[in-house]
Design a protein with these regions (language model features):
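Ligand-binding pocket segment of bilobal, Venus flytrap-like solute-binding proteins
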Residues: 1-74
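Structured segments of extracytoplasmic/periplasmic soluble domains
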Residues: 3, 19, 34, 38, ...
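Soluble non-cytosolic domains of exported or imported proteins
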Residues: 7, 26-29, 44, 93-98, ...
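Solvent-exposed, polar/charged alpha-helical surfaces in well-ordered, non-transmembrane soluble domains
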Residues: 14, 33, 37, 101-105, ...
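A short, terminal or domain-edge coil/loop segment
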Residues: 34-47, 62-66, 83-85, 122-134, ...
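Flexible, solvent-exposed loop/hinge segments that line or gate ligand/substrate-binding clefts
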Residues: 64-96
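Mature extracytoplasmic/periplasmic domains
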Residues: 86-145
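Extracellular/periplasmic bilobal clamshell ligand-binding domains
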Residues: 130-168
Length: 168
């Protein structure tokens, strides 16, 4: 809504609903499995779930399903791909902001970031290598720079818009 306006976003939402291969169900991995099995041609899923599936930690069946799909980063010619964040911060009235800051610095250290990306299959915030499962998808993609603050501000409007579009 913030980037394209309410009218264009609602038209997009209606097209999305009209093109669903099935009623929305399951989690991200269920969407990936639906594509792998031929039930759908395309799905929206967080990239780290494909990493988890490819790692084999979720079982051989999920690994094989993930091998059958291709991940793409949409909107590369436009605004870029939406990126979720896993974040941490210091509350305004934190009783010990100095230690909280030290903890944040620890979380941003190469050692911790390497551990996190190798276990979560997320992309790192600092310049450390991504997991081998994720490296095959590429690192050079355009990210949407919309502030996460906007998501919260626009959330009620987005929910009403998707209700009008017929999302279930």
């Amino acid at each position: 809504i913030a980037k394209n306006g309410e009218q264009a976003t609602e038209a997009w939402g209606k097209s999305l609903v009209k093109n669903l291969a099935r009623k929305p169900q399951g989690n991200d991995r269920a969407q990936i499995i639906a594509v792998a099995s031929g039930e759908a041609d395309i799905a929206v899923a967080n990239s780290y779930y494909i990493g988890i599936m490819l790692s084999g930690t979720a079982g051989e069946e999920q690994r094989e399903a993930a091998k059958k799909v291709q991940m793409i980063f949409p909107n590369q010619q436009g605004k870029g791909t939406h990126v979720n964040i896993s974040g941490a911060g210091i509350l305004k009235y934190a009783p010990n902001p100095n230690n909280a800051n030290l903890f944040l610095e620890f979380l941003l250290s190469d050692k911790v970031q390497k551990h996190m990306v190798s276990k979560s299959y997320e992309y790192p915030i600092v310049n450390v290598a991504v997991s081998k499962e994720m490296s095959g998808f590429g690192l050079d993609f355009k990210e949407d720079n919309t502030s996460v603050k906007v998501y919260g501000e626009m959330n009620p409007d987005a929910i009403r818009l998707m209700d009008r579009a017929g999302w279930k």
